[in-house]
Amino acid sequence: MNQIVRKAYAKINLGLDVVRRRPDGYHEVKMIMQTISLHDELRFEETGGKEIILVSNDNPLLPEDAKDNLIYKAAECILREYGIDRGVKITLQKNIPIAAGMAGGSTDAAAVFHGLNELWQLSMSMEKMQELSVKLGADIPYCIMGGTALSEGIGEILTPLPAPPHAYILIAKPDISVSTKFVYENLHADTLQKHPDIDGMVDAIRNGDLHGITARMENVLETVTEKTYPVISEIKEKMREEGALNALMSGSGPTVFGIFEEEDKAQKAADRIRELKLSNQIYVTTFVNVSL
């Protein structure tokens, strides 16, 4: 039976600015998105039936649970768009922490667009996949593209950028949950004292200047989360103490990442954070600049 396997890479935000809150309630952003080597894996198999079957980490999801999942919604979107009258079994091996600010759900949905495009030979262009997927989530079009990108508007305007220089990325997710809605509701974009130098970071990326990139790492959402969850600041501080060029919260959190030039320093920092019990979901990764 035909079978396709796809990797779904996590993302981090090297810089994140909120420009303003629009009259419709959405926030206009300007941010640098970057895929990293931490990934989920999805396997796609045709079935004899007509249902979408979703299995996660060897546990079949009940239909009522599966239908709320972005993977299911992405598959349903493709079936509807192309009038496909066939079933598919999607098996997910979940490695990316959930609700972590790393687009774990969005990247899985992006893998569905790529996987089913190949399985059913639909010949969808990247633009077509992005156009369909934006209805499901603002981060999915970026995840379909992957790599390094400047993201503007409400996240739908994407400008591809060259890969940054090689580095080791330490990921640490503290054992807390952060509501994205809470963060944005408590962010006062119009009164922010300082905005990240996203344009300067774009130049540093184009010039292959790792130190220029890390010197400009800022995330305005930290102005909300660090007050509520001091562990985020603690993890950042420990990473810098252990030799990170810089450390930052990704997205709306709570995951923190640090950028290191040497793998042994990243590993040592990981050991220290684990020892201090600041996080038990810790990974040493690298930048990835390939499409799904």
Where are these regions (language model features)?
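ATP-binding N-lobe of GHMP and related small-molecule kinases
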Residues: 1-100, 118, 122-127, 154, ...
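ATP-dependent small-molecule kinase catalytic core of the GHMP/sugar-kinase superfamily
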Residues: 2-7, 15-31, 122-246, 259-292
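Residues embedded in well-ordered beta-strands within globular domains across many folds
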Residues: 43, 89-91, 248, 283-286
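Short, basic/glycine-rich phosphate-binding loops at helix/coil junctions
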Residues: 50-64, 112, 207-217
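A generic structural signal for short
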Residues: 63, 101, 223-224, 258
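Glycine/serine-rich anion-binding loops at beta->alpha junctions
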Residues: 91-120, 138, 245-260
